């Protein structure tokens, strides 16, 4: 929200006036508090036992807080080495930190500051150029300039400059939204299902017939709307749909109606060594079926990091699923175009959406199951991430959650339809097609990379000049 526009001012004071060690320590303590508040919902996972859930929450909070402590240490180092420079480099180093934090098996761009600004739609329009890190850059410029005005006792003299810094993204974003709204957009009409099924009950053998009956009833309702595509949520039925006998029911439905269907399903492959299981989706197309295997898995929930290289790690039991990673940015044919499907946690990583868009997807579907998180802020955060992806790639998105928040989002990030947590609903709407590659789709995190290079050059300059 708006508090973050000035909320870093006390920390900036610490970074610029404490030793490196004390700066890191105080940053770590403050980050423990803020990260616990932001991500407490990790500890609400009803799909696992208490110990692994508690360890997941603790590990995530400590990891994110440690990274911020390093940030505080580096800022203090710059200030000690060359007084006055640290205040200038804070926005650039923040972008660098957010970008580097997205890499590796523990990458977590979910924590980027952009997610705090989705209520202010004009502000976040710049991310089709900068990526979500651009919002963190603007927030840090605001905070550093406010701090500068306070310590120099010049708030009254330079308030106009502060106002200009504040208002620029609002003006740009408002004009950009108006420009996009004036354009003619192609679209495809898609129907989606939010069945609101208890995920623990879903896998009980005694509930299987009831579940199939519920899903078939909702599916018939969706087909009666005569869309171009029907979307089901993640892991919709407790079967390996690709090899299940009930697959024929849905193939027949697609054939008779001439309307494709995409549903979440688990899948498997056998090779000479072992049997690999995937979280994925199956597309019942008009000419063929097609499978997508989830590329980005949730660490310690869907797999153990590095377990695909070191198989003995799979013997560890934290209640995780031991899925394998997919390997292809799959696109699905829909009349004359292609679209792609993102599964749950993947929507937090722009690199996944970018891979699909660059592979020819004209719009994105998202399948999710947020029931594990109960009705927490994590559910709402997860939906807001989809709005960021829509803006970054100027593409329409439709989201189907088992329960959570389902909906339709347009290329400006505007929510066109929304289904609340615990509601059961079948809905239909027009999903807008992207008009081509945005700057961010074409060049990726160029802005973040430039910030990283500037930090390296400044650090190198200080080290060389001291010698």
Question: What do the PLM-derived regions correspond to, one by one?
Answer:
Residues 1-177, 375, 386-389, 401-403, ...:
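Membrane-embedded alpha-helical bundles of multi-pass enzymes
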Residues 178-443:
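Soluble catalytic domains of enzymes that build or remodel membrane lipids, polysaccharides, and related
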